[in-house]
Swiss-Prot record:
Coiled coil: none annotated. It comes from Geobacter sulfurreducens (strain ATCC 51573 / DSM 12127 / PCA). Belongs to the universal ribosomal protein uL11 family. The lineage of its organism: Bacteria, Pseudomonadati, Thermodesulfobacteriota, Desulfuromonadia, Geobacterales. One of its GO terms (molecular function) is large ribosomal subunit rRNA binding. The gene is rplK. CDD domains: Ribosomal_L11. InterPro entries: Ribosomal_uL11, Ribosomal_uL11_bac-typ, Ribosomal_uL11_C, Ribosomal_uL11_C_sf, Ribosomal_uL11_N, Ribosomal_uL11_N_sf. Pfam families: Ribosomal_L11 (PF00298), Ribosomal_L11_N (PF03946). This is Large ribosomal subunit protein uL11. Part of the ribosomal stalk of the 50S ribosomal subunit. Interacts with L10 and the large rRNA to form the base of the stalk. L10 forms an elongated spine to which L12 dimers bind in a sequential fashion forming a multimeric L10(L12)X complex. GO terms for cellular component: cytosolic large ribosomal subunit.
Length: 141
């Protein structure tokens, strides 16, 4: 028989930088999860992507054990990395902070597709373009 699931915890943590301080400690502590065990496992698994924010879904079981799944970084993080900027524009329609090519849009959409609810790569590309526009990034051919 499968273990009984008592809850799911969704967090966004910088890769290889999980530590027991807030927000991780309190979120895991209230479910009775061994915080240090999670931090060590997460840091080991995300060592290659150091510095990038990684969404993680932690499944907590009745015996206080856990499993976790890491997901693809948020689309805005991927766009900022591709363009090479720290943050998006404060006035997206007036100030453009960078340019993104169609090829870069396709690359981001391909990477993010498993976590999206888009039916096709083209739909995912339109979603990436919309997010980029709302950040003040221009799409160029």
């Amino acid at each position: 028989m499968a273990k009984k699931i008592t809850g799911y915890i969704k967090l966004q943590i910088p890769a290889a930088k999980a530590n027991p301080s807030p927000p991780i400690g309190p979120a895991l502590g209230q479910h009775g999860v061994n915080i240090m065990e999670f931090c060590k496992a997460f840091n080991a698994k995300t060592q290659a992507d150091e510095g990038t924010i990684i969404p993680v879904v932690i499944t907590v079981y009745a015996d206080r054990s856990f499993t976790f799944i890491t997901k693809v970084p948020p689309m805005s993080v991927l766009i900022k990395k591709a363009v090479g900027i720290e943050s998006g524009s404060s006035v997206p329609n007036k100030n453009k902070v960078g340019k993104l090519t169609r090829e870069q849009v396709r690359e981001i959409a391909t990477k993010k597709l498993p976590d999206m609810n888009a039916a096709s790569l083209e739909a995912a590309m339109r979603t990436v373009e919309g997010t980029a526009r709302s950040m003040g990034v221009e799409i160029v051919n």
